[in-house]
Amino acid sequence: MAPKSSSSGSKKKSSASSNSADAKASKFKLPAEFITRPHPSKDHGKETCTAYIHPNVLSSLEINPGSFCTVGKIGENGILVIARAGDEEVHPVNVITLSTTIRSVGNLILGDRLELKKAQVQPPYATKVTVGSLQGYNILECMEEKVIQKLLDDSGVIMPGMIFQNLKTKAGDESIDVVITDASDDSLPDVSQLDLNMDDMYGGLDNLFYLSPPFIFRKGSTHITFSKETQANRKYNLPEPLSYAAVGGLDKEIESLKSAIEIPLHQPTLFSSFGVSPPRGILLHGPPGTGKTMLLRVVANTSNAHVLTINGPSIVSKYLGETEAALRDIFNEARKYQPSIIFIDEIDSIAPNRANDDSGEVESRVVATLLTLMDGMGAAGKVVVIAATNRPNSVDPALRRPGRFDQEVEIGIPDVDARFDILTKQFSRMSSDRHVLDSEAIKYIASKTHGYVGADLTALCRESVMKTIQRGLGTDANIDKFSLKVTLKDVESAMVDIRPSAMREIFLEMPKVYWSDIGGQEELKTKMKEMIQLPLEASETFARLGISAPKGVLLYGPPGCSKTLTAKALATESGINFLAVKGPEIFNKYVGESERAIREIFRKARSAAPSIIFFDEIDALSPDRDGSSTSAANHVLTSLLNEIDGVEELKGVVIVAATNRPDEIDAALLRPGRLDRHIYVGPPDVNARLEILKKCTKKFNTEESGVDLHELADRTEGYSGAEVVLLCQEAGLAAIMEDLDVAKVELRHFEKAFKGIARGITPEMLSYYEEFALRSGSSS
């Protein structure tokens, strides 16, 4: 029998190898997301718009090398790029490399997660492209037109928002950043004027709605124009480039972060030459909305580092060990793609204090893993961990020691200068012809937005625009949208709806009571303005003269004499953040909860400073410790004393307390430095009673009925303000009971009301308050 031919054997081998290749291809798993990494070659030239992708990924998505595809953040519009196959042996499967120029279009930073799609159609040829510079220079004075032409020709694909960085000028002694501000094709409709029912020659609107519309540059056919614009046309609605200049009110914090991040990332050997390891961790803490996350994005954009974000809840898994594995994967990626920054948002949620009762086994394992990973980063590595929290005391103390989170940077609530800076930057983003706010108007807004954080001010600007639009639509449905402008009145109207974040947890309706609503008591009103409004509104003058403002004011007097009403009017008229505290809400049956409630009230007041804390019936909260007060009441009083005048100074917060039993308040609370000023709010005099009667009877038609209000004012001698109001209400009720359609209230109705009202203020009561005034010696 003849032997088998070798050709038959080779066919079998060939078939086997083919099947092996097919099996290998079928086993390939397409990544769910891709990681942004920098371009392997220089950013300018023929590689500007190329994206290097693993060959197997291109095969799976049926994208041919050299054809168009789109990359973009997951769930967002993409950017058109030219696909190139990376080295199969070297290029990671889940990585897409992009040039700085392409990343600038979508504000992409290294480490961003991307999705990849095949482009359905070829972009149109551009008939016109407009070029500007980030510095606002006249480009033709700095560079030759042929240099720009070659730059765009090499790029091939152009789109608004592309930034070509660090281009040498004619002189060669400096560089500029060139930006494409606009591009168009005469055969296509203007992007800003597109109608949702329109279709176009390139395959429908879906193909036009990239993040930025792409065009092909054709040398000799595409006309180049030059502009002094510093950014892409607003009609494209591109993400705004993040830079330190865009952040308002955080100059000190920015300088601190720049030194703490950039040197360890890019020059860690400087530290090792001194025999010390560079700082590895930074803890940003401060109230929500102050700009912690925004600050990180700016640092990430400017430092050109690989950024990984850990959001507490997103990595927590119900399965044992998965959370720790996710943390290890993130730190491994950071070590692989150095220099890198790991940002942990809300770190208190994944690494709480292990000493807390509510901290379980899972939290303890996560904290232990995080400690191990931070210790294992090594002295020479270029990895920095930045964490953010608004509850720094809830973070495990082992993380806050040097060697882990070496530095702690507080991002506090902005002061008036910082608010002015933030508002100026916010309104500068609007076109100058869309608002009529000058520098003085913005200063006025900044002075009135006490306790507002950056996020609140952004919301205020947005709400102001809403008010402007509503005002325009209310007057004329066909109004020209370009004639609408944001005014100071719109901003003031928006301030009613947008409250400071620190005050949002306090469900307190701002009382709409004005000084004019309080009959008489002119001396009391003047004293309250002098002692409370003036120090808060003119704090700089007080500091310059070395005068300390009163810490607190005690309003005491008989019941019904407008003590609480005065506090409400003060809150409304001053425009200052107002916190009202009711005694029964403070006391809690659980040990320590009442004291915690007091601390929380003062914390909120400090956050929203300048502010007023109003304690109504304060004698219930601070009974005399020499009397029959309980242990719980003593603990609350001690907390109150410490908060008002303890080790931590109370700045920008004034205490207003009201009581009708001043001698039952503990003496320690009444001393100077706490409730320094005592104001007696006595029964209204004849003029004050007349004012109250006029306010309460203005709809009684007393002129027709012949009721003499002066006589009624004399007859109500010794009545409290509340009793005078009750007299009017009872008289009105008597008139209605006589006739449901009554038009006027007559004297007989008042006579009937007098019979049902007894004076609540006795001579003994008045002498009691006089004795207290003599004993305290600080009545005003």
From Swiss-Prot:
ATP 1 binds at residues 286-293. One of its GO terms (molecular function) is ATP binding. Changing residue 617 to Q: Increases basal ATPase activity. Reduces RLP24-mediated activation. Does not affect interaction with RLP24. Prevents the release of shuttling proteins RLP24, NOG1 and MEX67 from cytoplasmic pre-60S ribosomal particles. The hexamer is activated by RLP24 during pre-60S ribosomal particle maturation; RLP24 activates ATPase activity of both ATP-binding regions and increases cooperativity between AFG2 subunits. The second ATP-binding region is inhibited by diazaborine; the inhibition requires prior ATP binding specifically to the second ATP-binding region. It is found in: Cytoplasm. Residues 1-23 have a biased composition (Low complexity). ATP 2 binds at residues 557-564. GO terms for biological process: protein hexamerization; response to xenobiotic stimulus; ribosomal large subunit biogenesis. InterPro entries: AAA+_ATPase, AAA_ATPase_domain, AAA_lid_3, ATPase_AAA_core, ATPase_AAA_CS, P-loop_NTPase. It holds the Pfam family AAA. It is an enzyme of class 3 (hydrolase). It comes from the Eukaryota. GO terms for cellular component: cytoplasm; preribosome, large subunit precursor. Its main location: cytoplasm. It catalyses: ATP + H2O = ADP + phosphate + H(+). Residues 1-26 are annotated as: Disordered. Changing residue 346 to Q: Reduces basal and RLP24-dependent ATPase activity. Increases interaction with RLP24. Slightly reduces RLP24 release. Does not affect composition of pre-60S ribosomal particles or growth. Changing residue 725 to E: In drg1-1; slight loss of ATPase activity. No effect on affinity for ATP or oligomerization. Resistant to diazaborine-mediated growth inhibition. Its EC number is 3.6.4.10. ATP-dependent chaperone which uses the energy provided by ATP hydrolysis to generate mechanical force to disassemble protein complexes. Plays an essential role in the cytoplasmic maturation steps of pre-60S ribosomal particles by promoting the release of shuttling protein RLP24 from the pre-ribosomal particles. This step facilitates the subsequent release of other shuttling proteins such as NOG1 and allows the transition of the pre-ribosomal particles to later maturation forms that bind REI1. Essential for viability. Belongs to the AAA ATPase family. AFG2 subfamily. Homohexamer; ATP binding induces oligomerization. Forms a ring-shaped particle of about 12 nm diameter, that displays 6-fold radial symmetry. Associates with cytoplasmic pre-60S ribosomal particles containing ARX1, ALB1, RLP24 and NOG1. Binds to pre-60S ribosomal particles soon after their export from the nucleus and is released before REI1 and LSG1 are incorporated into the particles. Hexameric form interacts with RLP24 (via C-terminal); the interaction recruits AFG2 to pre-60S ribosomal particles and promotes AFG2 ATPase activity and RLP24 release from pre-60S ribosomal particles. The first ATP-binding region binds ATP with low affinity whereas the second ATP-binding region binds ATP with high affinity. ATP hydrolysis mediated by the second ATP binding region releases RLP24 from pre-60S ribosomal particles whereas the ATP hydrolysis mediated by the first ATP binding region is subsequently required for RLP24 dissociation from AFG2, probably by disassembling AFG2 into monomers. Present with 799 molecules/cell in log phase SD medium. This is ATPase family gene 2 protein. It comes from Saccharomyces cerevisiae (strain ATCC 204508 / S288c) (Baker's yeast). The gene is AFG2.
